[in-house]
Amino acid sequence: MSKNLRGNFKWLAGIASVSLLGACGVPGDAASGEQLVGEAQELRQGDVAVSLSAKTSTIGAQERATLSVTLTNTTRHPVRLLKWYTPAEELEEPLFSVTLNGEAVAFEGPHYKRPAARDTDFLTLAPGESLTRTVDLGLYDLSRTGNYGVRFEVEAQKAHGSSAKQGLLKSNDVNVWIEGRASSVQQPSDVTPSLTSSISYSGRCSTTQMSTLLDAMNAGSAMADNSTAYLSTTTPAATARYVTWFGAFSLTNWNTAKTQFVAIKDAFDTKPITLDCSCKKSYYAYVYPNQPYKIYVCNAFWNAPMTGTDSKGGTLIHEMSHFTAVAGTDDHAYGQTNAKSLAISSPTQALNNADNHEYFAENTPFLQ
C-alpha cells in the first residue's frame, strides 16, 4: 500500500471540476509581481480543473476501455502535483469512481506502501498549462456488460491524510457502454516458487534476500502475536496504545481491531505465503488484495530496519492487512502523524487503514 504522504499539500473540491494538489514555492507571474510563499499552501477552489471524456460511447470486449483526462492549471502561478494521485503515469491508485447500474465497481489494482514523496514524484504545470493523458480502466472489474458511469473522484483525506479538508474531489461524469471482458490484473505466476516451510519465494530472490525475508516474516509474526495478545488479554479501555492508533474507545471498535489482528496472526501462522522479489520500484511493497497471500517487496523494503517504525516486519503487517481474506484494509492516511490524526478524526477509517495497523503492531515509541 501506498503511504507516507506527509501532508505536503492541501486539496479543495471543485464543483464540476476538481482542485488538485498544492502550489510549488517558485515565483509567480512576473508581470503581476505575484510572489508565492516558499512552502505548500492551500489552493483556492478550481485552481486546477480536471475534465473527463470518452472518444466513443461504446467499447467492445476486444477494445481497451480508455478515457481521456485533462488537468489544467487555471491560476497565474505554477502548481505542483503529486504524480501518484494524477493520471500522469501509470494508474496506481483508484482515482475513479466506477459504477455499473448504480453499483460500485471494484478497483482490482495493487495497494502500495511507499516512502515519503521526493521531488521526482511531482510534476509542475505552468499557468494555463494542461496535461492530457489516456487512462485505461483495466484495473477495475469490467467483467460484466452494461452502461458504466465513471468520474475522477479522490478523497482529500486519502490523498493528504487527516490534516486535509474532508470531502471528495470530483470531475464531470462520463457514461460509456462497455462489453464485459476478462480481468487485466496481473495473476500469480505459474512458475513453481522456491519453498521453505509455509513460505514461498518467487521473482528470482537471492539467497541473501530469502534469508532477510525469513527474518522479516519472523519479525512480522512476532508483532502480530504481540498485538493479538494485547487486544485479547488487556481489559478493553482507552489505553494509550489503542487510542493513539484507533481513536476514541468503544468496545465494538476494540473487538474489531482484535478480530483483524487475530486474522493477521492466523495468516502469518497458517497460510501459504509467497514473497516476491521482482519489484524494482522505489516503494516498500505492494499486494493485490484479492490475491492472498502473495506480497511483492520493492527497493525501499531492503533498506528498512527489521523492527521499529516503517520496518520490514511492519511492512509485512501492513500488506497482510490489505488482503480481503484477512482484514481488507485500505490506505486513507500515510505516516505516523497522519495516522494519529486519522484516529482522532475518524476511528472507523483508522480501523480500515493499513498504516494504523502497522504502527499499532510496531508500537514505536512504546505505548502501554
Q: Where is each model-derived feature located?
A:
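Predominantly extracellular/secreted Zn2+-dependent metalloproteases
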Residues: S57-Q62, L67-T70, T74, T86-P115, ...
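Bacterial N-terminal signal peptides that target proteins for export
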Residues: S2-A13
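C-terminal motif of bacterial Sec signal peptides marking the signal peptidase cleavage site
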Residues: L20-A23
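Low-complexity, acidic Ser/Thr/Pro/Gly-rich terminal tails and inter-domain linkers that flank the onset
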Residues: G33-A61, T74-R76
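Short, hydrophobic/aromatic beta-strand segments
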Residues: H77-Y85
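Bacterial signal peptide processing site
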Residues: G25-G28
